[in-house]
Curated annotation (Swiss-Prot):
Catalysed reaction equations from the record: adenosine(37) in tRNA + dimethylallyl diphosphate = N(6)-dimethylallyladenosine(37) in tRNA + diphosphate
Pfam families per record: IPPT (PF01715)
Subunit record text: Monomer.
Protein name per UniProt: tRNA dimethylallyltransferase
Amino acid sequence: MELFLNLESRPGLIVICGPTATGKSGLAIALAEYLNTVILSADSRQVYKEFDIGTAKPTVQERQQVAHYLIDICEPTDNCTLAQYQEQANQLIQHFHQQGKTPLLVGGTGLYIQAVTEGLIIPRVAPQVELRSQLAQLAQTQLYAYLQQVDPVSAQRIHANDQVRTLRALEVYYVTGIPLSQQQGRNPPSYPICKIGLESEQLTHRIQQRTLQMLEKGWLAEVEFLLKQYGDDLPLLKTLGYAEMKQHIAGETSLEEAIQLTVLHTRQFAKRQRTWFRADAEITWLNGDDAQLLEKLQPG
């Protein structure tokens, strides 16, 4: 396909991005098998161990089909920074280029993808333990509202419930006095990049079905285990889906209400993802509902 013409002369990078639940993972696995290559995850929650079902991590079987990287690289109590992710991703890309492979970078975390494909120059601000402890005493709604005041550009990029990234953006601002969004220069990589975006006209249905499938796989048990293991204050348990299931486990909502809230908040999140990716003119958009999508991507 013409999309891949710039990758014929030397190894590069194929990006598969777009809103959640549009079929990125399925297409990526099929395409990686066809191209005999690997998948690099671009998901800010899949980097954490033990957060499996609710983050839609690839299954053991899928990881046996195709090698996946940048999954389970941090402990749930760690703070995996954008700089750490970028460094590991760049090392892996270089490693596979030396093998003559063009890896796939797959996910819905726009900032992760941007950090790799545009070579963002990220502020090297070390974690501020005391500052984080003070900020963590505030409600996430308060933290996010403050971020909207001091760094509205970063706030637009970060989900309102994402305490990890909210704290990081505030941390950079407190230490340097300059918003994170104003400190990210660029040094784009020299290798060719092909960007594919997926969207779906059946997104609400897909989100509903995926939420139910997660519950069937034992999502509630996963959340209960994480609560017992790490406690109610773990920032990751305040993120999309986990927060709603945690409310249900605490008896604050019925299961049906938790499902409805998860679907609603996921739809809102998907809308923000779409807005983010639509701003990138280099992305070629395809229909994730197309059953012949892989065939259309193949040469000839």
